[in-house]
Amino acid sequence: MATKKAALACSVCGSRNYSKSVSEGKRGERLEINKFCKYCNQYTLHKETK
């Protein structure tokens, strides 16, 4: 399986703070993780973008 890079964007302010390698296999939904956003200065939900 090949891997691609996906950016994780803050759901509050929209800034793309993190990048992650994900496999291109059978994935039904996008990745959602609670991470720290340095612009919001709090832990928020980060969603996978292209």
Curated annotation (Swiss-Prot):
A biological-process GO annotation: translation
Transmembrane helix in keyword set: no
InterPro entries: Ribosomal_bL33 (IPR001705), Ribosomal_bL33_sf (IPR038584), Ribosomal_zn-bd (IPR011332)
Keyword terms of this UniProt record: Ribonucleoprotein, Ribosomal protein
GO cellular component, one term: cytoplasm
NCBIfam families: PRK00504.1, rpmG_bact
Family as reported in the entry's similarity comment: Belongs to the bacterial ribosomal protein bL33 family.
Protein name per Swiss-Prot or TrEMBL: Large ribosomal subunit protein bL33B
Source organism of the structure: Enterococcus faecalis (strain ATCC 700802 / V583)
